[in-house]
UniProtKB/Swiss-Prot annotation:
Single GO molecular function: structural constituent of ribosome
Pfam families reported in the protein's UniProt record: Ribosomal_L28
Annotated keywords: Ribonucleoprotein, Ribosomal protein
Region (Disordered): 1-20
GO cellular component, one term: ribosome
Organism listed in the record: Campylobacter fetus subsp. fetus (strain 82-40)
Biological process annotations from GO: translation
Family that this chain belongs to: Belongs to the bacterial ribosomal protein bL28 family.
Source species, domain of life: Bacteria
Protein name: Large ribosomal subunit protein bL28
UniProt xrefs under HAMAP family: Ribosomal_bL28 (MF_00373)
Disulfide cysteine pairs (residue numbers): none
Gene3D superfamilies on file: 2.20.150.30, Ribosomal protein L28/L24
Length: 63
């Protein structure tokens, strides 16, 4: 399973862990993915993985 949002395509970003001594090691920032059920146009439901920020936008636009 890929770590990518099914709607926006948001995926992992690359950055650094930075210690107090300013030593840097590579790390990945993962998107906050949630599995949700969505209703498709034909009336069927399907589980997709979307980012939490996408869920907030979907909730805002549905009202």
């Amino acid at each position: 399973m890929s770590k990518r949002c099914a709607i926006t395509g948001k995926g992992p970003m690359v950055g650094n862990n930075v210690s107090h001594a300013n030593n840097r090691t590579k790390r990945r920032f993962m998107p906050n993915l949630r599995t949700v059920r969505v209703m498709l146009e034909d009336g069927t439901t399907r589980k997709i993985r979307v980012a939490a920020s996408t869920l907030r936008t979907m909730k805002k636009q549905s009202h």
